[in-house]
Amino acid sequence: MKSKHMMIFPTILAMVFSAPSFSHSEHKAKADYDPIETEFGSYEPDLHASRTVEVRMNDNMRFSPEVIRVKQGEVLKLIHQNEGKLMHEFVLGTPESLAEHAEMMKKFPTMEHAEPYMAHVPPGEKMEMIWKFSNSGEFAFACLIPGHFDAGMK
């Protein structure tokens, strides 16, 4: 009996101290994404950015800059800085796909985002993405956390 109790305590300790290492297992590193092609661009692990754009987001439900202009085939490194106290997202898409996805998020607010064109950025944190844009012009992006899109974060 004594040996059973002696084994329970170390087991509980191991579980408690290993939990933090699993707490962010749903987040992929950039190199872990599979190649993908969409109507607004593509991702593959070996992309090299020709320029870097820092996108700041805040609790006033705004992005800065509000617009990103790109050339056809341009590869950008996007650095997302959450300057707020709330969780924010940066999701690339078309105006239609973003509006549709925002509606879906209202029904499924805990839906995971695990695509290379999506960044879930905790308060005070930075995240990066690299993306190859398919066409020149302005590209749509938004925060799809329920309420943020409707408050103007698009």
Language model: regions and residue ranges:
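Asparagine-centered strand-capping/turn motif at beta-strand->loop junctions
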Residues: 80-82
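Extracellular/periplasmic metallocenter environments
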Residues: 24-36, 62, 115-154
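Short aromatic-acidic-glycine turn motif
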Residues: 96-107
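Bacterial N-terminal signal peptides that target proteins for export
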Residues: 1-9
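Beta-strand signatures of extracellular beta-sandwich domains
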Residues: 54, 89-93
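N-terminal edge beta-strand
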Residues: 45-75
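N-terminal signal peptide c-region/cleavage motif recognized by signal peptidases
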Residues: 18-20
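Short beta-strand and strand-turn-strand segments in soluble, beta-rich domains
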Residues: 106-114
